[in-house]
């Protein structure tokens, strides 16, 4: 190597190391009483706050997070959306990458800040996401994004302003909230023999209220046609906006268990008790960044499907699940539990105070949520603006509906990656058919026809360290194995299992890699290969510009119509990765599967501090 070449190498290494820095964080997890919606219950605090602190890093930073468990129960922390390339021991999934952190103990997570974008972190121990351990993550990118912003505006000042706005966004962690802890909530379902999913509030950045607008008002807020299409004539919601818990359309079946709706405590399904508290306020400055502001939304919901809008303001959706997309302009958007969205808003309206409407848009409950976007200096102004959504999330006009993002409609969910990134065409190397639904009880969920993923699966012998522990056992039905360097298709079928022909959506999240949704259609999957399905139903597939995400929604099916989806990904990140529904009740009920990606290139050099024996 010449002297000049060596000099260039030294310079390159210097700047690489100068850019990537080591960032150390400390998270102390405690359990105490709080009242984020004005009604007291016990919940999880992180460093004394709820929700957990926002963590901001630069791409490729070396991250070290020490988690101290100061509760009387187990905990882990999952870094949702981070690929954990070469660090599968830091994914934070009990039974796969680690043992749970016992009370009084600590665990140190080490990983690269990658990929850039909007992510989040949360507990992955049983249903404890319900209890409040979640916070936003922002990884600021190295690269230039001029090509992204130029799709929104060709003005050079605007492009620079949007880059600056995206570098320092507003963070909105949106969560649903119940008066019951996760353990209490799950016990209500198992005691009553009914899947219970009624909530009390929608919170934004840990703030919200309990609204009781009256049963007649809530009945009028039902999505048009929902009762007629899905439920018996005359079905009415409760004064909390919830459907009757014992409806066959909700509970499925028949199941060989006894339904005991009388064991559902008061105020779970009905008996609304209002509380005034406070809603989150987002102060924005139109004098900064040429009037552009970026907002990062995290759907830290456990059951609800969230819709958001800002009165009188359109927005450009430019990032989903930490992956940049070709921007599109909307006035409202629907987020599924687990997803993250980033939007760019032009502050071009009359300075004032504008309502942010953030209701539950799912068919589970009519439930409103609110925050305020306030132009700086207008904190004392009266609210102004045009509403795009009603209390229950219905569009206020046909134009609003035309300009809204719906993940279950392929014509609006055509959010292709930027820069272009598409999967291999033709057949994959491996195909796995996963049949989703309920088995045996309304709260038991499977991903492979019959097996339920236990919440303590392999907790003592995590699969990262014991990848063959389930072989020759019935539990091997909970494990998929793939080869490194292969293209894999995951085919998800819903609404075909006995007793589960009426199926609510599932929000399917894969750890360790993003997937392209290349196909979506109605009916029963009865093809010998994806390639055969493409030949027979080309209109149901897209391999040129499919979306790329880590969380996808399956179809809502009431009335027996089956649906399937096809997700494709490339195996280049060996490790044990959980693939599961991000609705906490469904995961607690068994809707998960362990995917051991790259078993032929399994991590061999695991740092000694992470070894278990």
UniProtKB/Swiss-Prot annotation:
Pathway: Pigment biosynthesis. Residues 1-20 form the signal peptide. Cu cation 3 binds at residues 124, 511, 580. Residues 29-142, 171-359, 468-598 form the Plastocyanin-like domain. Belongs to the multicopper oxidase family. Cu cation 2 binds at residues 80, 122, 582. The gene is Mlac1. Laccase; part of the Pks1 gene cluster that mediates the biosynthesis of an anthraquinone derivative pigment that contributes to conidial pigmentation that provides protection from UV radiation, heat and cold stress. The polyketide synthase Pks1 produces 1-acetyl-2,4,6,8-tetrahydroxy-9,10-anthraquinone though condensation of acetyl-CoA with malonyl-CoA. The dehydratase EthD and the laccase Mlac1 further convert the anthraquinone derivative into the final conidial pigment. Gene3D superfamilies: Cupredoxins - blue copper proteins (2.60.40.420). PROSITE patterns: MULTICOPPER_OXIDASE1, MULTICOPPER_OXIDASE2. The keyword Chaperone does not apply. Cu cation 1 binds at residues 78, 509. Its main location: other. It is an enzyme of class 1 (oxidoreductase). GO terms for cellular component: cell surface. This is Laccase 1. Keywords: Copper, Glycoprotein, Metal-binding, Oxidoreductase, Repeat, Signal. Glycans are attached at residues 74, 256, 279, 444, 468, 484, 526. Binds 4 Cu cations per monomer. Its EC number is 1.10.3.-. It is found in: Cell surface.
């Amino acid at each position: 190597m010449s002297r000049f070449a060596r000099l260039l190498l030294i310079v390159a290494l210097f700047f690489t190391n100068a850019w990537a820095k080591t960032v150390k964080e400390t998270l102390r997890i405690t359990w105490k009483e709080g009242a984020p919606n004005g009604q007291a219950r016990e919940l999880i605090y992180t460093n004394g706050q709820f929700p957990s602190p926002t963590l901001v890093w630069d791409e490729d930073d070396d991250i070290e997070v020490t988690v101290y468990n100061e509760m009387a129960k187990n905990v882990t922390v999952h870094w949702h959306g981070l690929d954990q390339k070469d660090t599968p021991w830091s994914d934070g999934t009990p039974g796969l990458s680690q043992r749970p952190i016992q009370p009084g103990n600590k665990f140190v997570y080490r990983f690269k800040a990658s990929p850039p974008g909007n992510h989040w972190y949360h507990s992955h121990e049983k249903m404890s996401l319900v209890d409040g351990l979640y916070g936003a993550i922002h990884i600021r990118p190295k690269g230039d994004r001029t090509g992204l912003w130029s799709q929104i505006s060709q003005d050079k000042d605007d492009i620079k302003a949007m880059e600056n706005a995206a570098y320092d966004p507003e963070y909105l962690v949106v969560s649903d909230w119940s008066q019951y802890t996760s353990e209490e909530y799950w016990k209500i379902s198992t005691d009553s023999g009914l899947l219970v999913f009624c909530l009390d509030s929608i919170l934004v950045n840990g703030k919200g209220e309990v609204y009781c607008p009256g049963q007649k008002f809530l009945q009028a807020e039902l999505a048009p046609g929902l009762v007629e299409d899905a439920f018996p004539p005359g079905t009415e919601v409760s004064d909390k906006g919830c459907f009757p818990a014992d409806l066959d359309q909700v509970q499925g079946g028949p199941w060989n268990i006894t339904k005991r709706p009388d064991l559902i405590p008061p105020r779970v399904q009905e008996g609304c008790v209002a509380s005034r508290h406070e809603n989150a306020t987002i102060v924005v400055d139109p004098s900064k960044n040429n009037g552009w502001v970026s907002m990062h939304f995290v759907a830290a919901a456990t059951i609800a499907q969230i819709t958001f809008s800002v009165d009188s303001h359109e927005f450009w959706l430019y990032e989903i699940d930490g992956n940049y997309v070709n921007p599109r302009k909307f006035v409202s958007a629907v987020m599924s539990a687990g997803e993250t969205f980033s939007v760019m808003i032009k502050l071009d309206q009359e300075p004032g105070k504008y309502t942010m409407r953030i209701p539950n848009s799912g068919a589970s409950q009519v439930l409103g949520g609110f925050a305020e976007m306030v132009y700086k200096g207008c904190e004392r102004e009266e609210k102004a603006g045009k509403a795009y959504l009603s209390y229950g999330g219905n569009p206020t006009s046909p134009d609003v509906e035309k300009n809204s993002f719906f993940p279950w409609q392929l014509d609006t969910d055509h959010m292709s990656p930027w820069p272009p990134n598409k999967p291999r065409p033709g057949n994959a190397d491996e195909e796995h058919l996963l049949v989703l639904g309920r088995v045996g009880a309304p709260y038991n969920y499977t991903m492979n026809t019959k097996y339920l993923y236990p919440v303590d699966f392999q907790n003592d012998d995590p699969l990262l360290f014991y990848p063959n522990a389930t072989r020759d056992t019935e539990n091997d039905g909970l494990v998929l194995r793939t080869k490194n360097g292969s293209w894999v298709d995951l085919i998800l079928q819903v609404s075909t299992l006995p007793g589960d022909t009426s199926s609510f959506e599932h929000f399917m999240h894969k750890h360790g890699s993003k997937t392209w949704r290349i196909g979506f259609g109605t009916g029963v999957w009865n093809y010998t290969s994806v390639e055969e399905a493409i030949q027979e139903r080309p209109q149901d597939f897209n391999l040129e510009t499919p979306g790329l995400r880590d969380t996808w929604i399956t179809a809502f099916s009431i009335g027996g119509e089956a649906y399937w989806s096809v997700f494709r990904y490339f195996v280049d990140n060996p490790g044990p990765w959980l693939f599961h529904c991000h609705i906490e009740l469904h995961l607690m009920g068994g809707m998960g599967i362990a995917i051991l990606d790259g078993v032929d290139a399994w991590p061999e050099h695991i740092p000694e501090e992470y070894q278990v024996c």
